[in-house]
């Protein structure tokens, strides 16, 4: 899920050297994108909806993770009961992200730590008490 348009998301993935074919279904990039809805939490809903259509298994919100670098990214997951992993690669540091996320990483340079975090993260409803709009810029 990203606030970017589908086409921009694909360009960003390709520019990072990522083979986007692994994220495609029927030739179309799979997920939730900015051109799906203006309300960002609805993008998570859309990504989950698409996953349910593509995968024949019973999926729950805990089968997904929202990864982002702002409290508002975490909010998108939390309103959908999806755990959020915050990464301090943007304007928010570790301290600015720890209270609004279910897990926080400084960056993705330690692949083993990153994957272990993704595998173990659990949604914690306490984070819904966080004031996501306080001191947040888009």
Question: What are these model-derived regions, one by one?
Answer:
Residues 2:
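Conserved phosphate-coupling serine/threonine residues in phosphotransfer and NTP-handling enzymes
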């Amino acid at each position: 899920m990203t606030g970017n348009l589908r086409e921009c998301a694909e360009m960003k993935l390709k520019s990072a050297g990522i083979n986007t074919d692994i994220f495609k279904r029927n030739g179309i990039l799979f997920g939730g994108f900015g051109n799906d809805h203006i309300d960002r939490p609805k993008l998570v809903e859309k990504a989950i909806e698409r996953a349910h259509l593509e995968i024949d298994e019973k999926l729950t919100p805990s089968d997904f993770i929202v990864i982002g670098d702002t409290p508002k990214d975490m909010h998108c997951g939390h309103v959908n009961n999806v755990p959020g992993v915050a990464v301090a690669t943007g304007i928010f540091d570790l301290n600015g992200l720890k209270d609004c996320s279910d897990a926080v990483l400084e960056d993705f340079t330690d692949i083993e730590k990153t994957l272990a975090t993704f595998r173990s993260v659990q949604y914690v409803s306490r984070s819904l008490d966080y004031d996501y709009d306080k001191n947040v810029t888009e």
